[in-house]
């Protein structure tokens, strides 16, 4: 079955009672004030159709969803052996901002989608781009077709003001020789990436290339090769939802990437991308109602990579 607007609306009605059972991220003060009752979904098909329901056009901070975009840029710039000697490809099984595993493994992060891995990727982008945050913003605007996407400066500044743990991660990696630049300028770019302000429609369209073998609908030149597209989707399927990746694979069965702003992007290779948003999180830091919405959609339309 193909998704329809009615299916999306019915699913949001079913998951709405979950609102109040999760917790909005409060360790970043600018995120703590987001209303907890927001709920939206957008589906973008490979033939260019966009379906929406709920608060799909309201912007929010995409947070760690941006890590998949930063990885995409890094894969364009670096040879595989350069990239993967600095960051791994395995699930961590730890909290996304954990230092314990990082020290045990000599400063090499488990994967690009935990904080340590994304900070290494930011360090690599900083080495190649004169203005990394502007390059990322240009990239997102190109993919989404929306020139009005911006960084939320309030969120970025809030993260910078509460950056001690991420700075500790960066300095620990630097002590092991896995960090090339000054820490704070790299972190500033990292926080700006997390502070991208987008909505479900923007996100669903932006990630279209991952559902289409690296080709973005409406853009002639490939964004990544088919092999790179497969690799990014594989990492999203195994590592994209922190230490809840296995639960997400079991319930939803799609490559995905979440953020503590309450957004999740999910990929149905060869067919569509799906973006959901609900700010309240489960204990793993993933959207509680958003995950349930994706689970129901997977069941209703009969889509899964498994």
UniProtKB/Swiss-Prot annotation:
Protein family (similarity comment): Belongs to the glutaminase family.
GO-annotated molecular function: glutaminase activity
HAMAP family on file: Glutaminase
Example of a GO biological process term: glutamine catabolic process
UniProt xrefs under Pfam families: Glutaminase
Enzyme class: hydrolase
Oligomer and partners: Homotetramer.
Cysteines joined through disulfide linkages: none
Catalytic activity: L-glutamine + H2O = L-glutamate + NH4(+)
Enzyme Commission (EC) number: 3.5.1.2
The keyword Transcription belongs to this UniProt entry's keyword annotation: no
Provenance organism: Aliivibrio fischeri (strain ATCC 700601 / ES114)
Superkingdom: Bacteria
Residues holding substrate: 64, 115, 159, 166, 190, 242, 260
Protein name in the entry: Glutaminase
Gene3D superfamilies: DD-peptidase/beta-lactamase superfamily
Keywords (A to Z) from UniProt: Hydrolase
UniProt keyword annotation of Hydrolase present: yes
